[in-house]
Curated annotation (Swiss-Prot):
GO molecular function: rRNA binding; structural constituent of ribosome
Family: Belongs to the universal ribosomal protein uS19 family.
GO cellular component: cytoplasm; small ribosomal subunit
Role according to the record: Protein S19 forms a complex with S13 that binds strongly to the 16S ribosomal RNA.
Short name of one Pfam family: Ribosomal_S19
Region (Disordered) residue spans: 1-29
Bias (Basic and acidic residues): 9-28
InterPro entries linked to this entry: Ribosomal_uS19 (IPR002222), Ribosomal_uS19_bac-type (IPR005732), Ribosomal_uS19_CS (IPR020934), Ribosomal_uS19_SF (IPR023575)
Protein name, UniProt field: Small ribosomal subunit protein uS19
Amino acid sequence: MARSLKKGPFVDHHLQKKVDVQNKEGTKKPIKTWSRRSMITPDMVGHTFEVHNGRKHLTVFVTDNMVGHRLGEFSPTRTFKGHPIKK
């Protein structure tokens, strides 16, 4: 079920704080996060995030097309080895 529009997008406070500090300073260092549930907002465009997938952190560079999606969508948790070969 989709989130109500009147509530607005969910972003963890600690993650938003890090983005705001980098925007104020003008730096673009990678931000390491475990918050896969946070939604990508327009002020995150151009930043690089290291999103945890359960085993390691995968690098995600945020572009305009990613706004409105969640960080976890770009860091897959399962590896697909392919369908089994029929004998």
